[in-house]
């Protein structure tokens, strides 16, 4: 057995990055096929592979950080920098959607009737489901902050309650978003308004689902007493991600739902 003379974690070979990349490739290919009226079987297969990858990868990271002690203070610092860079990349990702929306709306082309929303498009009322969803996400931001304070104050019960509330609000938001899509009078292939609306809000909805899964894993780990007030990066990363999702939604609500309508 060799003695490690540094504080870094030398990660063992893992198949999960490969299976995760394969599931992402299958998902994008499946979506392209579905958009062209082909079978959606590949989408379901990719989702199954992605969920399996997430489960196995989370399991391995939990083992390494909680039971094997590989997540030293230096490793946690590096993970925090990594999460910050990931969120910055997500900001750039959504910036492209907002750029597309404002490019189309501030100078509508003749194809759109020189007006915004384009002629024939009945936009959604921003003060119905969108406003309710805004209140839900803001409330979930408060509850996840409550969970963080409960963890720092070592009140296990309060953290479980507040984290459960956050997850329920995330699921409720997703259900309302689906209902909004189902009842909309336009679709993704109608014009620039439909495509920018569904792509921007759809990707945000996907991030909400991922964040809800992230927080659910944190809840299960908290029930097994994995987190302490000084060793809880998994939850910290989930909370950062959730706050990012909240902020993106505020920009979506103001730009696309309110100003864009």
Curated annotation (Swiss-Prot):
- Lineage summary: Eukaryota, Metazoa, Chordata, Craniata, Vertebrata
Q: Gene encoding this chain? A: MT-CO3
Give the Pfam families listed for this entry.
Answer: COX3
Q: What does this protein do?
A: Component of the cytochrome c oxidase, the last enzyme in the mitochondrial electron transport chain which drives oxidative phosphorylation. The respiratory chain contains 3 multisubunit complexes succinate dehydrogenase (complex II, CII), ubiquinol-cytochrome c oxidoreductase (cytochrome b-c1 complex, complex III, CIII) and cytochrome c oxidase (complex IV, CIV), that cooperate to transfer electrons derived from NADH and succinate to molecular oxygen, creating an electrochemical gradient over the inner membrane that drives transmembrane transport and the ATP synthase.
The portions of this protein that span the membrane are 16-34, 41-66, 73-105, 129-152, 156-183, 191-223, 233-256
What's the source species for this entry? Answer: Myxine glutinosa
- Provide the protein name: Cytochrome c oxidase subunit 3
Q: Where is this protein localized, as stated in its record? A: Mitochondrion inner membrane
Q: Where are the Mitochondrial intermembrane topological domains?
A: 35-40, 106-128, 184-190, 257-261
Give the CC-aspect GO terms.
mitochondrial inner membrane
State which ranges are Mitochondrial matrix (membrane side).
Answer: 1-15, 67-72, 153-155, 224-232
Membrane topology annotation: Multi-pass membrane protein
